[in-house]
Amino acid sequence: MAKMNTEEAFVKVLQMHGIKHAFGIIGSAFMPISDLFPKAGITFWDVAHESNGGLIADGYTRSTGKIAMCIAQNGPGVTGFVTPIKTAYWNHTPMLLVTPQA
C-alpha cells in the first residue's frame, strides 16, 4: 500500500465519516485538500462569508440527516462561525468545523 500524505489522510477520514458536502471559504491552507475533494466525492460550496457556510451546513444536516463540514480561514473567518456553532448546538445538530492552524 502506498503511503498517504497528510492531505490524503484527512480526506480519507472525511470519506469514512460520510462527508459529502463542505461549505465555506477555501484559502491557501486548504488548497491541497480542496484539490482532492472531487475525486473523493466531496462537493465544495463556496460562500461569501463563513457564517453563511455554517448556517447552510446546519440546514443541510437538519434536512438530510447527514453531517456536513464547514471550512473557515484564520482570524475573522473563525469568529464568523460563532452564530452557526451556537445554532447547531442548541438544535443538537452535528457539524464538523475545520479551520487552519491559527
List each model region and its residues.
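N-terminal alpha/beta PP-like core and its mobile active-site loop of ThDP/TPP-dependent enzymes
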Residues: 1-102
